[in-house]
Curated annotation (Swiss-Prot):
Residues 1-24 are annotated as: Disordered. Pfam families: Ribosomal_L16. This is Large ribosomal subunit protein uL16. It comes from Kocuria rhizophila (strain ATCC 9341 / DSM 348 / NBRC 103217 / DC2201). One of its GO terms (cellular component) is cytosolic large ribosomal subunit. GO terms for molecular function: rRNA binding; structural constituent of ribosome; tRNA binding. It comes from the Bacteria. Keywords: Ribonucleoprotein, Ribosomal protein, RNA-binding, rRNA-binding, tRNA-binding.
Length: 138
């Protein structure tokens, strides 16, 4: 699981899910990638589930890059608790993903294998996403 080792503050404000991604919109490391088409909070468990789905499908060949990191805590109050008395305890770690962001990349496998592996990973994510190819020559 991806979790920060140390954080300056244990609890943070919720990040905004508006606007487009400023950077990280191109496939830079691999040959194929998953690009977000809608905003979402992606938890560390969802990132890990997508990674496992991809690596199991490509077996021993290929390489996978994860371009997002869950660096923000999301808090939750216990069930049946009255309102007030402070903010809840940190429950999950999330990455704030905006539309256009390339989240995962893959290379070293054929087009059919890459597309199927990325399709399996997209089903593990909480937003609309598409498969994109690297632009330009090698």
């Amino acid at each position: 699981m991806l979790i920060p080792r140390r954080v300056k503050f244990r609890k943070q404000h919720h990040p905004r899910r508006r606007g487009q991604a400023k950077g990280g919109t191109q496939v830079t490391f691999g040959e194929w990638g998953i690009q977000a088409m809608s905003p979402a909070y992606v938890t560390n468990r969802q990132i890990e589930a997508a990674r496992i789905a991809m690596t199991r499908h490509i077996k021993r060949g290929g390489k996978v890059w994860i371009n997002i990191y869950p660096d923000r805590p999301l808090t939750k109050k216990p069930a049946e608790t009255r309102m007030g008395s402070g903010k809840g305890s940190p429950e999950w770690w999330i990455a704030n993903v905006k539309p256009g962001r390339v989240m995962f990349e893959i290379s070293g496998v054929s087009e059919d294998v890459a597309r199927e592996a990325l399709r399996l990973a997209i089903h593990k994510l909480p937003m609309k996403a598409r498969i994109v190819r690297r632009e330009g020559g090698e």
